[in-house]
């Protein structure tokens, strides 16, 4: 039963987990997350230098806690994994150095994991995970992408956001409405009492140079601007700001756009399964709408378990175990970190010399 210790420090969540593969099923033996949300809330967003310092403070304790809970000594692991890209460089370095050091000290393979590959693997932590091929809507604070996942770790991006990710749009609109950071949960709570049809908002589209639109791509900057102008107009008219209706209308149009383009892409690709992963995949309205419209179109919808939608180390361990059992020997201990790296080039993370 292959077992890994996994670390995640790509942004503002410090996390450690122990995972085991038992008869083809992933088992999360222990998982711990130290959130930095309260620390960053006073600035309305993540401060990279603060995030790095908090990772340094939290990660050793998290590793100790998961080892104790798992009742596992380092000698009994088959590998150590850590996120190495993409993310905040300083934050990534904390997890990467910790992971590589533990691997070197205990003569274990080290797996440098692409953060998005971790999100894609998070659905494998569900009780009944889907089998590829399928289309993944990866929707989080930093990413909004449509990715076809096939056998043998095949990952092909078919759609993306050309500006803000959906999660960024939630945060920015949340600030506009005077809500707490992060914006996603705050907007969802407020929208529950609002009228989602009160305000008409644009579904941003991305033009092609030769005319027409990219059918599977996203743009949320126009929606964000429309919300700003709407709030300004209501304020200038001395109206009481209908924050619940504004939140509900915004949440609805985001969900509509994500669902419509995901299902269009799946149908065009001949795929009968759509998977949702990432922090925004925890949004209740999005989950319900995708399930309803997917059922209407004969498309099966799977979502990563709620506790594994936001950043966590269990998904990093899941990705590492996939690589380990497929015969990958691991990454070089000289592998560094990169703030950006394309998902379709993850294979080179396991080559020598390392790409960065």
UniProtKB/Swiss-Prot annotation:
Chain sites annotated for binding substrate: 138-142, 171, 184, 283
Gene designation: tsaD
PANTHER family: TRNA N6-ADENOSINE THREONYLCARBAMOYLTRANSFERASE (PTHR11735), TRNA N6-ADENOSINE THREONYLCARBAMOYLTRANSFERASE, MITOCHONDRIAL (PTHR11735:SF6)
Cellular component, GO, one term: cytoplasm
Binding, Fe cation: 115, 119, 311
A biological process term (GO) from this entry: tRNA threonylcarbamoyladenosine modification
Cofactor binding notes: Binds 1 Fe(2+) ion per subunit.
UniProt function note: Required for the formation of a threonylcarbamoyl group on adenosine at position 37 (t(6)A37) in tRNAs that read codons beginning with adenine. Is involved in the transfer of the threonylcarbamoyl moiety of threonylcarbamoyl-AMP (TC-AMP) to the N6 group of A37, together with TsaE and TsaB. TsaD likely plays a direct catalytic role in this reaction.
Species of provenance: Prochlorococcus marinus (strain MIT 9313)
Record InterPro entries: ATPase_NBD, Gcp-like_dom, KAE1/TsaD, TsaD
Protein name, UniProt field: tRNA N6-adenosine threonylcarbamoyltransferase
Pfam families hit by this protein: TsaD
Catalytic activity, as annotated: L-threonylcarbamoyladenylate + adenosine(37) in tRNA = N(6)-L-threonylcarbamoyladenosine(37) in tRNA + AMP + H(+)
UniProt-annotated location(s): Cytoplasm
């Amino acid at each position: 039963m292959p077992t890994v210790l996994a670390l995640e420090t790509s942004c503002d969540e410090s996390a450690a987990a122990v995972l085991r593969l038992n008869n083809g099923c992933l088992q999360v033996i222990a998982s711990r997350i130290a959130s930095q949300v309260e620390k960053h809330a006073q600035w309305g967003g993540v401060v990279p230098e603060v995030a790095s310092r908090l990772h340094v403070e939290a990660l050793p304790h998290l590793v100790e806690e998961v080892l104790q809970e798992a009742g596992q000594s380092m000698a009994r692991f088959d590998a150590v994994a850590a996120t190495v890209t993409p993310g905040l460089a300083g934050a990534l370095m904390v997890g990467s150095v910790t992971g590589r050091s533990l691997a070197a000290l205990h003569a274990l393979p080290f797996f440098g994991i692409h953060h998005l590959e971790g999100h894609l693997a998070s659905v494998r932590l569900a009780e009944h995970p889907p089998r590829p091929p399928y289309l993944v809507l990866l929707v989080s604070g930093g990413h909004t992408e449509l990715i076809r996942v096939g056998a043998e770790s095949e990952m092909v991006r078919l759609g993306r956001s050309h500006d803000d990710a959906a999660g960024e749009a939630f945060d920015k609109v949340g600030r506009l409405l005077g809500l707490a950071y992060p914006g996603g949960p705050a907007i969802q709570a407020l929208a529950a009492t609002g009228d989602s049809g009160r305000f008409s908002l644009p579904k941003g589209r991305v033009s092609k140079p030769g005319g027409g639109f990219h059918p599977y791509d996203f743009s949320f900057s126009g929606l964000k601007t429309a919300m700003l102008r709407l709030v300004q107009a209501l304020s200038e008219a001395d109206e009481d700001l209908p924050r619940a209706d504004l939140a509900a209308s915004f949440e609805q149009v985001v969900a509509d756009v994500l669902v419509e383009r995901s299902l269009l892409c799946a149908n065009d690709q001949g795929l009968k399964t759509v998977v949702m992963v990432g922090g925004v995949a925890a949004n209740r309205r999005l989950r319900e709408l995708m399930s309803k419209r997917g059922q209407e179109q004969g498309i099966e919808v799977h979502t990563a378990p709620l506790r594994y939608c936001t950043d966590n180390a269990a998904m990093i361990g899941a990705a590492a175990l996939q690589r380990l059992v497929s015969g990958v020997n691991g990454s070089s201990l000289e592998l560094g970190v990169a703030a950006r790296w394309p998902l379709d080039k993850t294979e080179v993370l396991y080559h020598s010399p390392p790409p960065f």
